[in-house]
C-alpha cells in the first residue's frame, strides 16, 4: 500500500495463545507447542498450562502464568478469526513482559514505583520511558525507610541511574521465583520404564514396529 513503517519489526509475530479456546481444541489428537529457539523454561511453562487446561479447564491464574515467560503479546490466530493486521507486534522483537506498575516519582535518590503486582528481588524489569526501554535486574529493593526488602506488593523504591518520568510504565520480563520453580520441574527425574521394540522392514512392504 506504499505505507512507511520506519524502523518497525514487520516480521515480529505475536505469540499464538488459544488457551481460552481449549474446549474447541480438545477433539484434536495432538497439540504442537511452538518451542523453536525458546528457552527450556518457556516450553515447560506452556506445556504445563495447556496440559492443565486440557485436564481441568483454565482460569485467570493459568492465563497470568503464561505471561511469565517470553511473549510479544498474544494473538488467537486465523483459526479464531484474528484480524491479519493484528498478528504481529511491530513495536518490538523481544520479550514484552507484563505490566506490574508505574513510576510515581523520585524520592531520596531513588525512584518510587506504585505496584499492581508483586515485585521480588532479582526480578528483571523494563521501564517504558518516552518509547525507549530501561532494562534492569532488581538487585536491591527498598521500602520507604530505605531498608532492603525481598519483595514489595504495593510501593517500592529502586536506585536507577537512567532518567525516568512519573507515569512511565513498568513491566516484569522475568520473575525470579517463578523461573526457579520451572527449573526445579525441569530437574526432576522422569519415570523410566523398559520398552521392547520389534521392527519389521522388507523391500516393497510397509514398515511395521511393535512395541511391548
Sequence positions of predicted segments:
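Surface-exposed amphipathic alpha-helical tracts and adjacent flexible/coil segments at the periphery
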Residues: 1-212
Amino acid at each position: 500500500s506504499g505505507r512507511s513503517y520506519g524502523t518497525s519489526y514487520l516480521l515480529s509475530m505475536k505469540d499464538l495463545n488459544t488457551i481460552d479456546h481449549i474446549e474447541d481444541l480438545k477433539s484434536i489428537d495432538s497439540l504442537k507447542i511452538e518451542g523453536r529457539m525458546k528457552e527450556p523454561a518457556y516450553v515447560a511453562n506452556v506445556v504445563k498450562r495447556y496440559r492443565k487446561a486440557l485436564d481441568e479447564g483454565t482460569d485467570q491464574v493459568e492465563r497470568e502464568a503464561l505471561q511469565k515467560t517470553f511473549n510479544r503479546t498474544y494473538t488467537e490466530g486465523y483459526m479464531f478469526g484474528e484480524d491479519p493486521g493484528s498478528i504481529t507486534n511491530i513495536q518490538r522483537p523481544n520479550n514484552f513482559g507484563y505490566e506490574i506498575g508505574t513510576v510515581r516519582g523520585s524520592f531520596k535518590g531513588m525512584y518510587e514505583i506504585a505496584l499492581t503486582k508483586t515485585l521480588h528481588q532479582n526480578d528483571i524489569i523494563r521501564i517504558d520511558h518516552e518509547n525507549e526501554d530501561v532494562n534492569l535486574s532488581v538487585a536491591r529493593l527498598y521500602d520507604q525507610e530505605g531498608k532492603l526488602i525481598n519483595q514489595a506488593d504495593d510501593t517500592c523504591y529502586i536506585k536507577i541511574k537512567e532518567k525516568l518520568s512519573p507515569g512511565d510504565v513498568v513491566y516484569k520480563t522475568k520473575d525470579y521465583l517463578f523461573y526457579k520453580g520451572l527449573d526445579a520441574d525441569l530437574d526432576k527425574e522422569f519415570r523410566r520404564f523398559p520398552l521392547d521394540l520389534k521392527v519389521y522392514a522388507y523391500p516393497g512392504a510397509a514398515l511395521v514396529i511393535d512395541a511391548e
